[in-house]
């Protein structure tokens, strides 16, 4: 491994370790996403707790965390294998951030950003797949899972030389969503949107000492 490749991998991990959800919520005076809602510091949980504007900011920053390192590696003409390692490093930084006690998010938005430098046509297909799945099912996690499963086939069709690194990235996303897959199978996964009345009742009735639910876990009034 060259010094350039090693440096890019380390840089990607450090970029991924910047938790935009925590920083945006702190700057906006919103609750810490690690201690509220699902407990997951990601755009979906920020959407539930803080609204669309804060969630949009988190989403953009998370995408850039994956896009910038991989784009730099791409311009340096690194091999597809090391491009894949750079993308995985960015996602690992998001999932296990060194700056925030290794407690991070799911890595979906960062993975989208890491794939973007391969081609905007591929990125459009990926975003379209996620959006269509969420609109039809209401499950953000299902959108991520379906997108991760189909991503290697999209890449194989457009730029087959990147199939292996994207497949590695997809495996990481699927492993990270193993709890969501189990809840989807049992029919206990929560949807991305909830009625405001149900949310207010759930928040008012939950004991202060109660631990936050898992990401995308159904949150109904007791």
Swiss-Prot record:
Q: Where in the cell is it found?
A: Cell inner membrane
Instruction: Name the pathway it acts in.
Output: Lipid metabolism; phospholipid metabolism
Quote the catalytic activity from the record. an acyl phosphate + sn-glycerol 3-phosphate = a 1-acyl-sn-glycero-3-phosphate + phosphate
Instruction: Locate the region Disordered.
Output: 192-222
- Under Enzyme Commission nomenclature, its number is 2.3.1.275
Q: How does it sit in the membrane?
A: Multi-pass membrane protein
Molecular function in Gene Ontology = acyl-phosphate glycerol-3-phosphate acyltransferase activity
Indicate, by first and last residue, each region the UniProt record lists as having compositional bias (Basic and acidic residues). Answer: 213-222
Q: Name one GO cellular component term.
A: plasma membrane
One BP annotation, GO = phospholipid biosynthetic process
InterPro entries xrefs: G3P_acylTferase_PlsY
Q: What class of enzyme is it?
A: transferase
Q: Which PANTHER family match?
A: GLYCEROL-3-PHOSPHATE ACYLTRANSFERASE-RELATED, INNER MEMBRANE PROTEIN YGIH
Task: Please describe the quaternary structure of this protein.
Answer: Probably interacts with PlsX.
Q: What job does this protein perform?
A: Catalyzes the transfer of an acyl group from acyl-phosphate (acyl-PO(4)) to glycerol-3-phosphate (G3P) to form lysophosphatidic acid (LPA). This enzyme utilizes acyl-phosphate as fatty acyl donor, but not acyl-CoA or acyl-ACP.
Family named by the database record:
Belongs to the PlsY family.
Its protein name is: Glycerol-3-phosphate acyltransferase
Species, as recorded: Edwardsiella ictaluri (strain 93-146)
């Amino acid at each position: 491994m060259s010094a350039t490749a090693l440096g890019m991998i380390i840089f990607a991990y450090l970029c991924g370790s910047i938790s935009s959800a925590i920083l945006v919520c702190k700057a906006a005076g919103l609750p810490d996403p690690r201690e509220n809602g699902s407990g997951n510091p990601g755009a979906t949980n920020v959407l539930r707790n803080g609204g669309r504007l804060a969630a949009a900011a988190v989403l953009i920053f998370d995408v850039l965390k994956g896009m910038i390192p991989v784009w730099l590696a791409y311009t340096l003409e690194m091999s597809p294998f090391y491009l894949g390692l750079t993308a995985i490093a960015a996602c690992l930084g998001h999932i296990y951030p060194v700056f925030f006690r290794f407690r991070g998010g799911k890595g979906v938005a960062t993975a989208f950003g890491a794939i973007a430098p391969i081609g905007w046509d591929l990125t459009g297909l990926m975003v379209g797949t996620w959006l269509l799945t969420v609109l039809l099912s209401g499950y953000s996690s299902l959108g991520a899972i379906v997108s991760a499963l189909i991503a290697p086939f999209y890449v194989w069709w457009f730029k087959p030389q990147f199939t292996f690194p994207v497949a590695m990235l997809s495996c990481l996303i699927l492993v990270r969503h193993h709890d969501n897959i189990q809840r989807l199978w049992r029919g206990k996964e929560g949807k991305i949107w909830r009625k405001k009345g149900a949310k207010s009742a759930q928040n008012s009735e939950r004991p202060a000492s109660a631990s936050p639910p898992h990401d995308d876990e159904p949150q109904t009034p007791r």
